[in-house]
Amino acid sequence: MDQDDAAEERFRSLHAASYTDLLRFVKRRIPDDDADDVVSATYLIAWQRFRELPDDVRPWLFGIARNLLANQARKRLRRSAVDVRMVATAEADRSPGIDARVDLVRAWWAVSAADREVLALVAFDELTDVQAAAVLGCRPATFRMRLNRARKRLRAAMGPTLPTAVESWSRT
């Protein structure tokens, strides 16, 4: 096996290990129809910069995808760089907890796009503080401060019905 074959095999392994998480990350931010294009462009950049990839490639890939999403947003003249899509589905029978979920969705959209992104990186994408900081291009201490402030603002927007799950978001 020559160097090119080894590099191709390593890239295939990287793709297999990260594709689902990366696609999920992108789909939470843009319509599903556009997500595959962003993910493909992310892997194209990863292939072009393959020799420069960091050891912990997952946050690096998320950062590349985030930059591509921001570029798309600027092209479309959107106000925010990235919107996290969150769809509330209320059941007709008003099952237990539905009111709290609806309140959470309202509170989610009441906080800024920057706060939603910080919260989503730890709650939905399950990144550590260090990984999320790498995605945003800031120091881990700065990210932790942003996360703490975002959680406080979400808590304030939610009021007394804040679900306990939100309280546990990234206590790492």
Which stretches of residues belong to each language-model region?
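Arg/Lys-rich amphipathic alpha helix in sigma70-family domain 2
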Residues: 52, 62-84, 96-100, 149
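A short pre-motif secondary-structure segment
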Residues: 118-122
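C-terminal edge and immediately downstream basic/flexible tail or linker adjoining helix-turn-helix-like DNA-binding
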Residues: 2, 10, 152-172
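Short, charged helix-capping/linker segments at alpha-helix termini
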Residues: 2-13, 23-41, 49-55
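Short, aromatic/basic-enriched loop-to-helix "N-cap" motif that marks the start
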Residues: 49-63, 140
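DNA-recognition helix of helix-turn-helix
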Residues: 66, 70, 136-160, 164
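Helix-turn-helix DNA-binding module
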Residues: 3, 109, 113, 125-142, ...
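Acidic, proline/glycine-rich intrinsically disordered inter-domain spacer in sigma factors
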Residues: 2, 6-9, 76-79, 84-109
